[in-house]
């Protein structure tokens, strides 16, 4: 650890997870995605060491805030988000979850206001799968299982 208590030198094999994500059940989905996201960085770096920029990431300021549903501007982060979501939520698990929770083959809109029953079923599905609502909605969009996502209005 550096002399600054908020900066850590990362060796490329260490995952730094915020302590508040560790024990609280309401952060379980976010914690699981954070770990999957960091695993995705490692996979991408090992597959594409010359093209992937992990070697430049040696310091992490854990106070950096990240707003939910933010627009992705960093290609490496987008790749890790996408692969992390696929690791955490394989297509067959998402489709089976949609069946179990009565969401059909596809959702037209994800909205607490416009379709509260489906929204509640979606929330139960996210909890069941150990994913955050944001990650599950992102993955469903990737898979073409969600047409309009009002959870993260862009």
Annotated model-derived regions:
Residues 1-154:
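Active-site hotspot residues in diverse enzymes, especially metal/ion-binding acidic/histidine motifs
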